[in-house]
């Protein structure tokens, strides 16, 4: 029971005594009012979609086609561009109208959701069980809860399949690995081999292994969505048709707050994964839109100066740096030829502008001398000066390169925000899980405050 200074305060006809929660506990007052809780959820969805639409249009209004997206602080347009809308060869933005349409569609959707949220919060029935039993529920009804879980899984699976259909049949998606510097293409042969797809899940998360963040081709990425979309749809059907088994009934706490805690744990995990994915991966998050990764900017610096000095007559194969190690090229711990100097720590980086210059034993000296294309030089010079860790005059986190510009990479925004959100959602999971377990065990949440000294003191003012 929450303790209010003003215990008589009533909001919306629901006071602390009747609900067990103070006014600032918000939707907790609606735990047993399925109709009102539906209104809160729909209105919340409307707010989310409104932000997406409004921010989308804000980015369109401020977008300058002559500058890369990542120099303009954009976080939504890069996502739409990655889906292949309005993009030409090399990641050039050739049409902003699809971005405008996306913003307008989200705004219209938010209006519909907002109306539905207000209707159910203010006008609709307080509970749904009597009038609309299909949409009604009781938190302890285990069969109903797993049915709702199943419906959610089917919707998530359908969402995963939407990306598959877009990539395979409706215009394709942007592939940063397409020949010549990236392009929009149809993914006609996605990977369905379970050994490949689930191999990502079994990889180490450390170093060059990178767990699922190491996906480096669109075939595997779209194939992964085929698998997860299919599994979620079949899992949803399973949960709708079956009742929880005995071990599941005993293992879980079956209450509204428990389900909230499970959801917070899941979204926390997704936040941490999104953090790593947006920071390290340059296939799902193409560098043309999001800027280079940290290792990419560092490798680009080494490549740019190798190109420059090779033109000036340097023997890049044998030149030594001040430490006696290779100035331009050296050997990795496992024998591959890699870039030398400070960037050696990022030797397992892979990027579409660099991979054509590799051979079976790492970087190919003959290719470095004869096959470097102008687009590779331009792109590495651009990435060198746009490190995501960069502050003023910084490349790859090393504050020595005077050609850098002062900007904050979308990768920095996305990785930092998702890490922070993931952390706080995890704390929320612990909080609500503890409360739910305490309630299920039969003891009062919180502490007895009857003897707390502050309750007998005069108000400060």
Curated annotation (Swiss-Prot):
InterPro entries in the record: PS_antenna-like, PS_II_antenna-like_sf, PSII_PsbC, PSII_PsbC_sf
Record-linked Pfam families: PSII (PF00421)
Modified residues (N-acetylthreonine): 3
Propeptide, residue positions: 1-2
Modified residues (Phosphothreonine): 3
Single Gene Ontology MF annotation: electron transporter, transferring electrons within the cyclic electron transport pathway of photosynthesis activity
Main location: plastid
Entry's localization field: Plastid, Chloroplast thylakoid membrane
Residue intervals passing through the bilayer: 57-81, 122-143, 166-188, 243-263, 279-300, 435-459
Keyword entries, A-Z: Acetylation, Chlorophyll, Chloroplast, Chromophore, Manganese, Membrane, Metal-binding, Phosphoprotein, Photosynthesis, Photosystem II, Plastid, Thylakoid, Transmembrane, Transmembrane helix
Complex and partners: PSII is composed of 1 copy each of membrane proteins PsbA, PsbB, PsbC, PsbD, PsbE, PsbF, PsbH, PsbI, PsbJ, PsbK, PsbL, PsbM, PsbT, PsbX, PsbY, PsbZ, Psb30/Ycf12, at least 3 peripheral proteins of the oxygen-evolving complex and a large number of cofactors. It forms dimeric complexes.
NCBIfam families reported in the protein's UniProt record: psbC
Recorded family membership: Belongs to the PsbB/PsbC family. PsbC subfamily.
Protein name: Photosystem II CP43 reaction center protein
Organism: Oltmannsiellopsis viridis
Gene this protein is translated from: psbC
């Amino acid at each position: 029971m929450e303790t209010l200074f003003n215990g008589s305060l009533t909001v919306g006809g629901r006071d602390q005594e009747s609900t067990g929660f103070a006014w600032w506990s918000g939707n907790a007052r609606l735990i047993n009012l399925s109709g009102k809780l539906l209104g809160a959820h729909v209105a919340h969805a409307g707010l989310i979609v409104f932000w997406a639409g409004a921010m989308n249009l804000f980015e369109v209004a401020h977008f300058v086609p002559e500058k890369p997206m990542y120099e303009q602080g954009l976080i939504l347009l890069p996502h739409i561009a990655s889906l292949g809308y309005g993009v030409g060869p090399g990641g050039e933005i050739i049409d902003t109208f699809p971005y405008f349409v996306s913003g307008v569609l989200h705004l219209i959707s938010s209006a519909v959701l907002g109306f539905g949220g207000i209707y159910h919060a203010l006008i609709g029935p307080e509970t749904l069980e009597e009038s609309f039993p299909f949409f009604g529920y009781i938190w302890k009804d285990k069969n109903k809860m797993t049915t709702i879980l199943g419906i959610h899984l089917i919707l998530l699976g359908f969402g995963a399949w939407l990306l598959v259909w877009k990539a395979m049949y409706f215009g394709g998606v942007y592939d940063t690995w397409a020949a010549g510097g990236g392009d929009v293409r149809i993914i006609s042969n996605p990977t369905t081999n379970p050994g490949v797809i689930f191999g990502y899940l079994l990889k180490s998360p450390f170093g060059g292994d990178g767990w699922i963040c190491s996906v480096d081709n669109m075939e595997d990425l779209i194939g992964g969505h085929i698998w997860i979309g299919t599994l979620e749809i079949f899992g949803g059907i399973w949960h709708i048709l079956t009742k929880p088994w005995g071990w599941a009934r005993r293992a879980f706490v079956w209450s509204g707050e428990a389900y909230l805690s499970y959801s917070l744990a899941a979204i926390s995990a997704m936040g941490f994964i999104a953090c790593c994915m947006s920071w390290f991966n340059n296939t799902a998050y193409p560098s043309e839109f999001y800027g280079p990764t940290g290792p990419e900017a560092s490798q680009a610096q080494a490549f740019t100066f190798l190109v420059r000095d090779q033109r000036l007559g340097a023997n890049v194969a044998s030149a030594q740096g001040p430490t006696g190690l290779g100035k331009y090229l050296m050997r990795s711990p496992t024998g591959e030829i890699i870039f030398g100097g400070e960037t050696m720590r990022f030797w397992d980086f892979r990027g579409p502008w660099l991979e054509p210059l590799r051979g079976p034993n790492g970087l190919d000296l003959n290719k470095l001398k004869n096959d470097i294309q102008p687009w590779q030089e331009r792109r590495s010079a651009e990435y060198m000066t746009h490190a995501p860790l960069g502050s003023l005059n910084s490349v790859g986190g090393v504050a020595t390169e005077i050609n850098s510009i002062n900007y904050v990479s979308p990768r920095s925004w996305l990785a930092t925000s998702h890490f922070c959100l993931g952390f706080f959602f995890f704390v929320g999971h612990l909080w609500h899980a503890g409360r739910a377990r305490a309630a299920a065990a039969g003891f009062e949440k919180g502490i007895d405050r009857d003897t707390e000294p502050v309750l007998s003191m005069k108000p400060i003012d």
